Curated annotation (Swiss-Prot):
Gene this chain is encoded by: GLYATL1
SUPFAM superfamilies named in the record: Acyl-CoA N-acyltransferases (Nat)
EC number, as in UniProt: 2.3.1.68
Task performed by this protein: Acyltransferase which transfers an acyl group to the N-terminus of glutamine. Can use phenylacetyl-CoA as an acyl donor.
Top EC class, one word: transferase
Alphabetized Pfam families for the sequence: Gly_acyl_tr_C (PF08444), Gly_acyl_tr_N (PF06021)
Reactions catalysed: an acyl-CoA + L-glutamine = an N(2)-acyl-L-glutamine + CoA + H(+)
GO biological process terms on file: glutamine metabolic process
Family to which the UniProt record says this protein belongs: Belongs to the glycine N-acyltransferase family.
Protein name stated in the entry: Glycine N-acyltransferase-like protein 1
Length: 302
């Protein structure tokens, strides 16, 4: 694999990946952040250049110092020939199979190569899947070489009803001092490693909230290093009050103004969330969200 660290090549890759949306969105979003300051110190590997078949995004070596930190030890993959991913993944120079890690992608067909590679390394793997939800303007990037999102006005979604703030509630950037609050209410959180990860997401990536009467966030949303919007949550007392809808509208408007790509994943059985985000123009993509969590035998969580 070739390490791609030239800014011109990374920009060319970003534009090229747009042609493979939605399957490439995980990698496309990661390259966006790499091209805009690279706050999570990620690096890009391709099998060849300028023509390529596979792209892998991984943290730089100095980031992966904790063998148990699967929030940091994340590999994001896209392949034009996913059935051929096995040989690449078996290479210990590419994936550190001695660590607990995650492999994320939007191609189910990556799974066979991952399963073969993990079996050869005596690594336990757990597969989880969810629906990938996107908006029309994200899909339009596929047909455009500009790799820019349309403005909020161009999408035609009525946002006036959500724009105005209600008394005692204020839309704001989510402050890193509330990382603990987010961690305590995130299903995948509630531990020290997740707290560290959340702090980085809030500090370095777009995150928004609605402050309640006491000046404390009552609804919030964040973004991960691959431009996936997540951790969205409303405190129980303030649910069904329109606060999360107001946060989402303002947040999405900001992302579009800054030309930041975004998408979300929702469990198929979570019909309430699917209905909720549907009002903002999200719909099911032609592919799904996939994550393979891998544990070396000496680090299995049981």
């Amino acid at each position: 694999m070739i390490l791609l660290n030239n800014s011109h090549k990374l920009l060319a890759l970003y534009k090229s990946l747009a042609r493979s949306i939605p399957e490439s969105l995980k990698v496309y979003g990661s390259v966006y952040h790499i091209n805009h300051g690279n706050p999570f110190n990620m690096e890009v590997l391709v099998d060849s250049w300028p023509e390529y078949q596979m792209v892998i995004i991984r943290p730089q070596k100095q980031e992966m110092t904790d063998d148990m930190d699967s929030y940091t030890n994340v590999y994001r993959m896209f392949s034009k020939e996913p059935q051929k991913s096995e040989e690449v993944l078996k290479n210990c120079e590419i994936v550190n199979w001695k660590q607990r890690l995650q492999i994320q992608g939007l191609q189910e067909s990556l799974g066979e190569g991952i399963r073969v590679a993990t079996f050869s390394k005596s690594v336990k793997v757990e597969h989880s899947r969810a629906l990938l939800l996107v908006t029309e303007d994200i899909l339009k990037l596929n047909a455009s070489s500009k790799s820019k999102l349309g403005s909020w006005a161009e999408t035609g979604h009525p946002d006036d009803e959500f724009e105005s703030e209600t008394p005692n509630f204020k839309y704001a950037q989510l402050d890193v001092s509330y990382s603990g609050l987010v961690n305590d209410n995130w299903k995948r959180g509630k531990n020290e490693r997740s707290l560290h990860y959340i702090k980085r997401c809030i500090e370095d990536l777009p995150a928004a909230c609605m402050l309640g009467p006491e000046g404390v966030p009552v609804s919030w949303v964040t973004m991960d290093p691959s431009c996936e919007v997540g951790m969205a949550y409303s405190m129980e007392k303030y649910r069904r009050t329109g606060n999360m809808a107001r946060v989402m509208v303002r947040y999405m408007k900001y992302l579009r103004q800054k030309n930041i790509p975004f998408y979300i994943s929702v469990l198929e059985e979570n019909e309430d969330s699917r209905r909720f985000v549907g009002q903002f123009g999200f719909f099911e993509a032609s592919c799904e969200w996939h994550q393979w969590t891998c544990y070396p035998q000496n680090l299995v969580p049981f």
